[in-house]
A protein has these predicted regions:
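Conserved ABC ATPase "signature" region
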Residues: 63-80, 84
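ABC-type ATPase nucleotide-binding domains, specifically the catalytic core motifs of the NBD
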Residues: 53-62, 70
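Post-Walker A alpha-helix
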Residues: 1-2, 49
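Helix-to-loop junction immediately C-terminal to a conserved catalytic motif
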Residues: 5-7
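Conserved ABC transporter NBD signature motif
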Residues: 10-20, 30
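ABC-family ATPase nucleotide-binding domain "signature/switch" substructure
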Residues: 32-40, 48-51, 68-72, 86-179
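Conserved beta-strand positions that form and line the central face of beta-propeller blades
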Residues: 16, 21, 77-80, 88, ...
C-alpha cells in the first residue's frame, strides 16, 4: 500500500482515498495531502527547528513548532539539549536516539496536519508512555482535522484505536498481542 501511494504503478485495481483515485493525483498533490512517517525517518544536518519544519511551505513560528513537538512528546527532550530548537542534528540524526528521531518526524506530521497520515512502524522505538500520549494526539488529529490515518505496525497497542484493521496472514487471538 505504501508503495502504491508513493506513485509506483499498480498492476491491477485502483486505490482511492477520500474519493480521489491515487493514479490521477500528481506528486505535488500527494505531497500536499499525504504525510508518511517511516520507521527510520529522514533527518538532515540542520537544526531541530528546521528538521521539524521540513516540507512546510509557509512561515512557521517557534511556538507552532513547540506545540507540534509537545504533541509528539519531544519538546521536553529538546529543551534539555544545548541550543534547544537550534540544536544541530547530525546527518541522518545520528546524534539522537531512535525514539527522538521518530518523535521529531511525528512532530513534523503534527505541524503539517495532513489529510492522510501514513505511519509505517512510526512509533516502534518509543516507550509505552510516549506511544500512549501520541495515540491521543492521533485521535485528536482525526477528530479536529478529519485526518485519515493508515498505520502499519507489529505492536498491537499501536493499532488498538483504529476503526478497522487488516492483517497479513491468518488472524490470531488479539488479546495475546499476536495477529
Amino acid at each position: 500500500v505504501t508503495k502504491a501511494i508513493d506513485k509506483l504503478e499498480e498492476t491491477e485495481g485502483t486505490i482511492t482515498i477520500g474519493g480521489y483515485d491515487l493514479a490521477a493525483l500528481t506528486r505535488a498533490d500527494l505531497a500536499e495531502a499525504v504525510v508518511l512517517v517511516p520507521q527510520v525517518p529522514f533527518l538532515f544536518a540542520d537544526t531541530i527547528f528546521h528538521n521539524i519544519c521540513y516540507g512546510i511551505k509557509r512561515e512557521v513560528t517557534l511556538e507552532e513548532v513547540r506545540e507540534a513537538a509537545r504533541r509528539a512528546s519531544i519538546d521536553a527532550d529538546i529543551m534539555q539539549m544545548p541550543g534547544q530548537y537550534a540544536f544541530l542534528v547530525a546527518e541522518a540524526g545520528h546524534n539522537l536516539s531512535g525514539g527522538q528521531r521518530q518523535r521529531i518526524a511525528l512532530a513534523r506530521a503534527f505541524l503539517r496536519t495532513p489529510r492522510i497520515l501514513i505511519l509505517d512502524e512510526a512509533t516502534s522505538a518509543l516507550d509505552n508512555t510516549s506511544e500512549k500520549q501520541i495515540q491521543v494526539e492521533f485521535e485528536r488529529m482525526k477528530e479536529v482535522y478529519g485526518t485519515t490515518i493508515l498505520s502499519i505496525a507489529h505492536r498491537l497497542t499501536t493499532l488498538k484505536n483504529l476503526r478497522s484493521n487488516c492483517c497479513d496472514g491468518p488472524r490470531k487471538d488479539r488479546s495475546t498481542g499476536h495477529v
